[in-house]
Amino acid sequence: MFSCAKAYEDQNYSALKRACLRKKVLFEDPLFPATDDSLYYKGTPGPTVRWKRPKDICDDPRLFVDGISSHDLHQGQVGNCWFVAACSSLASRESLWQKVIPDWKEQEWNPEKPDSYAGIFHFNFWRFGEWVDVIVDDRLPTVNNQLIYCHSNSKNEFWCALVEKAYAKLAGCYQALDGGNTADALVDFTGGVSEPIDLTEGDLATDEAKRNQLFERVLKVHSRGGLISASIKAVTAADMEARLACGLVKGHAYAVTDVRKVRLGHGLLAFFKSEKLDMIRLRNPWGEREWTGPWSDTSEEWQKVSKSEREKMGVTVQDDGEFWMTFEDMCRYFTDIIKCRLINTSYLSIHKTWEEARLHGAWTRHEDPQQNRSGGCINHKDTFFQNPQYVFEVKKPEDEVLISIQQRPKRSTRREGKGENLAIGFDIYKVEENRQYRMHSLQHKAASSIYINSRSVFLRTELPEGRYVIIPTTFEPGHTGEFLLRVFTDVPSNCRELRLDEPPRTCWSSLCGYPQQVAQVHVLGAAGLKDSPTGANSYVIIKCEGEKVRSAVQRGTSTPEYNVKGIFYRKKLAQPITVQVWNHRVLKDEFLGQVHLKTAPDDLQDLHTLHLQDRSSRQPSDLPGIVAVRVLCSASLTAV
């Protein structure tokens, strides 16, 4: 998979390395030169920077020294603790870092074959729906012979500095990494989906049930190979880097390096005792300033845990920036968690698999309202439905749906200055079961995301069976940009873009006719259906000019709520729309009755309560039961 990563800027690693070895020169990257242009957007702030190769910084340079560890990393002078925290999380997952650092053994320095070294490295990152292979030379920025950005504990270990350089190249320059987002880096390292969680909402510090539920979700992400980060929000500039009395630092992104339930007690008593404590281990990218509260490295609470359990957890008494704390304390002191879940789409896995739909789209401006695709959020009602629209289906009675929208990063496309993200979000609407054309009026809103100027927005929601439309938007109309929409469901969702506003006119339209009316039929429910020992297992079918829409079966009730809609583009207005009610049975379904709907050219959404009829009867009430229906009709095909 990763050997097929797309070459960034068409730079081929193997070809460039072969050329350097043939010429016996060290690689110099023309696309990311050792100049101030690679450091800053504008100007040359700070001390004079000298670019040096690892061999000029130390005697025995290595990619890794004694393997890779979350303890390897330290933050540099740029405000990129978010990136260092993401790297710390990455370092704890061998299967993940080996994808980001491909063929690491081949890239490692070989003291026995110095002539095989060409000063060139490559790293893989997931960007905007695909893996890209980014090439860098080994020249690194230094001041007084010290690396000024991300660096390792060991002076001769360079993997983190080189990964950071490749990431800076992808972003445009090193300055672009100042004040970035951990969620973005976690996605770029994994191709997963980041879910931000605000710990200040929902009374998590005091509500044990909610806290336990969240811990189980965090534990599941960790146990299935995902990456997690946590932070304490700095409200003001003065808050940045402020140290709390408990030792935690505001404005820092901490890497979560372990999550587990810790058994309390000693010996057999501990084995049979049911009491366990929800614990989480974190690491500060600065490698110091640890938590000093309960369960810190030297706290007496560790006496409650057996020596073997402590050894298994890796508890050490060192000021190395890594520490344990209870999840309750974490919810009390931290304000944000980012869970980057690895979406499992493999059918061979024992864990839950997801079906992923991935679609690229864009917000574009146009003077013609039918071609404009930048309508802004729902606040702008006149233009909202001009945005891109995507339809998908939930095919189970209820399904957990994960939705992510990511805008194309602008940092790497604006060398004259820092590219700002647009404020983006999306709404999800429950629509007719057979909708094939774009929405033009409001329907039931099933869910909605927040609007925020981050690179991506995520929503996890439970949706009942049916068809839905996602409308991704910028907050303000007229803003343009590309985006990637990802929809994850338990079964295939058939997600696709709705491009047409109405049925297209073809050469057959003059012969077969063209729709004169659009009709939306909403069957709300029924009452008084034919008695059954176990209650009716009923469903409805809406029929119109050869097209059918069927509801889900409502089991064990004579007063079902169908809440099903159909939309029909009508050519033969004299023909009525028929709504049939059926009882589902094992061998053969039973007909319970039907109603006919005659529509006016412009029917309002009036509620009709109609008695069921037999198929051949003209009498209004010869069968038990009534059905409640709303009908909306319009001669304008873009009215609904």
From Swiss-Prot:
Instruction: Please report the stretch or stretches of sequence annotated as the Calpain catalytic domain.
Output: 26-343
Keyword Protease among UniProt keywords: yes
Name a biological process GO annotation.
Answer: proteolysis
Give the Pfam families listed for this entry: C2, Calpain_III, Peptidase_C2
Domain of life assignment:
Eukaryota
| Record has Transcription as a keyword | no
Domain C2, first and last residues per copy: 499-617
- Could you tell me the keywords of this UniProt record? Hydrolase, Protease, Thiol protease
Q: Which InterPro entries match?
A: C2_Calpain, C2_dom, C2_domain_sf, C2_III, Calpain_cysteine_protease, Calpain_domain_III, Calpain_III, Calpain_III_sf
Give this protein's Gene Ontology molecular function annotations. Answer: calcium-dependent cysteine-type endopeptidase activity
Query: What Enzyme Commission number does this protein have?
Result: 3.4.22.-
Provide a GO CC annotation, any one: cell surface
Please give the residue ranges the record annotates as the region Domain III: 344-496
Q: Where is the active site?
A: C81, H252, N284
- Its job: Calcium-regulated non-lysosomal thiol-protease.
Question: What family does the database annotate?
Answer: Belongs to the peptidase C2 family.
For this entry, the protein name equals Calpain-5
| Species name | Mus musculus (Mouse)
Which gene carries the instructions for this protein?
Capn5
